[in-house]
């Protein structure tokens, strides 16, 4: 295999309504919109990560994205719940992460996770 270095991997999400998606990602999740973006294609950025949004193209609704973060998942859960974000799964402690799932306006799922809580039992599905 040829040698190469991956600099970044950033998802491109198909959105049906750019203003609605920008409201969700910017006003609710705290991303910032790129200066060069327009009504059909843009890049939203938070910390050192970005997600591309493409109106009516490049992808399917229902894409899942892992978002690893450093913070209190229970505080984030309460904040998003109070903002009427669709919560698909409340925080659960797994062996790989303490995580929860939320849904954006186009049905894409953001799987938000942080380090597992080793002082608590792991979720086993029962």
Regions found by a protein language model. Give the residues of each.
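Amphipathic alpha-helical segments
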Residues: 19-32
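Short glycine/proline-centered loop/turn elements that form peptide/ligand docking sites
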Residues: 20, 37-42, 95, 118-120
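N-terminal beta-strand motif that seeds the catalytic metal site of vicinal oxygen chelate
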Residues: 1-22, 63-65, 116-126
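Conserved short beta-strand elements that form part of the metal-binding/catalytic scaffold
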Residues: 32-64, 109-115
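Vicinal oxygen chelate
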Residues: 1-4, 8-16, 45, 56-126
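Short secondary-structure junctions
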Residues: 30-35, 86-90
């Amino acid at each position: 295999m040829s040698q190469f270095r991956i600099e970044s991997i950033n998802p491109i999400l198909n959105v049906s309504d750019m203003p609605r998606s920008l409201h969700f990602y910017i006003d609710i999740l705290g991303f910032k919109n790129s200066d060069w973006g327009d009504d059909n294609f843009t890049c939203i950025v938070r910390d050192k990560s970005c997600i591309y949004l493409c109106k009516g193209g490049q992808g399917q609704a229902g894409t899942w994205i892992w978002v690893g973060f450093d913070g209190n998942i229970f505080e984030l859960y309460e904040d998003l719940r109070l903002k009427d974000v669709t919560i698909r799964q409340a925080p659960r402690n797994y062996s790989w992460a303490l995580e929860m799932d939320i849904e954006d306006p186009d049905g894409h799922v953001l799987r938000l996770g942080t380090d597992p809580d080793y002082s608590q039992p792991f979720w086993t599905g029962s």
